[in-house]
Amino acid sequence: ILSHFNIDELDQVEWVKMFSDVFRIAYLDRPKQKYEDSLELILSKDYAKKLFHSLNESKASKRTNAELNGEWIADIGHTTDLSASYNDGNVISFTQTIGPLMGSKVASDGLGFLYAVTLGGYLGDYKPGDRANSHISPTIVTKDNGFYLSLGAAGGSRIITAVTQVISNVIDKGMRLDKALEKGRIYHVNDTTEIENHDGIVWEFQKDEIPYIGICKFEAKTL
């Protein structure tokens, strides 16, 4: 969907509106991904073009802007993401989560890890061979048949939007990876677009320029 926009030419207001619209339509489409032909559908450029044109038929959000109550800062976390590269050129992107409150609190002798407890919401809904729906998104980007970028994130449903925006900052705006990671991000949820606004984030617009945003302090804790 993003390939149909000239992202490098957008100002910040246009950028926020564009990503908000795209995230909304993409999240509405996610339930279709558990069907047998879901991979073919996800990779289809024609289907992406169809979704792009559907953006003109609906608006991303309808609420007026407002300060969101409190800060969204996770005090604890249970997801680990890492990327690693090796001398021989191999690269991995890895995301592992065990679920809240130390997972199942069960471990097997000698194995050294706790078992996860994150599939409770899926029980009875899947048949053998199906994969549980998840937001974790370990990602490897290639260019000219070679490695270009590896990344992922922790953060539940914000993972997908964060990874997408960082990749776009690198590819579409030509940023270095560290600068792309530092840029403020948005997150669309429940017909409201949340704008990251913690210390160090600078936006070049006033919140009333985008009528459907919420200003929110959300950030990942560094351990």
Question: Which residues make up each language-model segment?
Answer:
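Short Gly/Pro-enriched turn/cap motifs at secondary-structure boundaries
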Residues: 71-75, 127-133, 217
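Extended C-terminal subregions enriched in glycine
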Residues: 88, 130, 163, 172-218
